[in-house]
Amino acid sequence: MQSIRRTRSLFTLCCRLVACMTLFASTALAQVKDFDSIKLYTLKNESGMTVRVTNYGAIISSIIVPDRNGKQADIALGYDRVEDYINAVDKPYFGAVVGRYGNRIAKGKFTLDGETYSLLKNNGENHLHGGAIGFDKVVWTVDEYVEGKSLTLSYLAKDKEEGYPGNLQLKVAYTLTDDNSLVVDYYATTDKATPVNVTQHTYFNLKGEGQGTILDHELMLNAKKFTPVDEGLIPTGDMPDVAGTPFDFTSAKAIGRDIGQQHEQLKFGLGFDHNWVLDKAGKDGELTLAARVYEPTSGRVMEIHTTEPGIQFYCGNFLDGRLKGKSGKPYVHRGGFCLETQHYPDSPNQTHFPSTILKPGEEHQSQTVFKFRRSN
């Protein structure tokens, strides 16, 4: 009899759990405005590269490129269905455009033109990636789709949305070229001074998504300095040299080579989750090399060029195998990395950092290029 009661209790608990999960999923879907207008768009070039983008969150859902033997693989982590992006309990920002301010703002507040603005705190005491409903969780308008070649999306972030001042009109354009370059252009205007720091949050695994860790990938960062953080991952304001530290990627090395060192910054980030100060040889607004990644098994190489002054290198420290991606593949600890071109975290509160303030009458322009090739 006790066994029957336990079985019934377990069955009841399971039913309640399923009902709760179903309610969460339906609630999450119900919160998405214009759900029926969400579509998937394909860019494809003459060199065999394919990129798929959805207008939900301006998310890059897949990037398919050949290896040294011509074998194709999807190297972008993500999901098969848009519902999975919407319903994910853990929000990893797979493939999304994040903003109005990508990265963190300390204590969820900043002062601009004598007025203090309070933002939604969604990362402990701090504000992260634009808040609870940032650009990654809204349906973007499709302005133009040139079949197979380019996709231009727009979104109007209204005054006080997630606490930010000003109506911000944002455009993001994805263009795939025949030399296997994915060009991402950002444009923004505002009717009131506001911080803007928009970036792309794709997780890469050049072996193929779901194919183990990225610790063997060899990374070069064109940066002799980085911005160390406190325990809340807010920059301290210093910009020390990387020489002699695990953060020195000025020459290519395996991501996993120094990640286990006893270093306070690695402890705070649970690995690499920091902003590097890019060496900018040209004028502001000019494209310069930011990073190069080589995966030895496949021979795939990715280069990133950007007009931005910084780049956030995050190596999937919070992935733990619970998230199931495309075709049900688990994404293991450090199973993907992000290279987010950006202005520095918490710039609105740190005046010696490059400014992120956009004013009426100005246009914010930024470009990042992800270029793929094969090495023998």
Annotate each language-model stretch with its function.
Residues M1-T12:
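N-terminal secretory signal peptides that target proteins for export/translocation
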Residues F11-C14, L29, T199:
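Intrinsically disordered, low-complexity regions enriched for glutamine and histidine
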Residues C14-S26:
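Bacterial N-terminal signal peptides
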Residues Q31-N376:
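An exposed, glycine/acidic-rich loop-and-rim segment of catalytic or binding clefts
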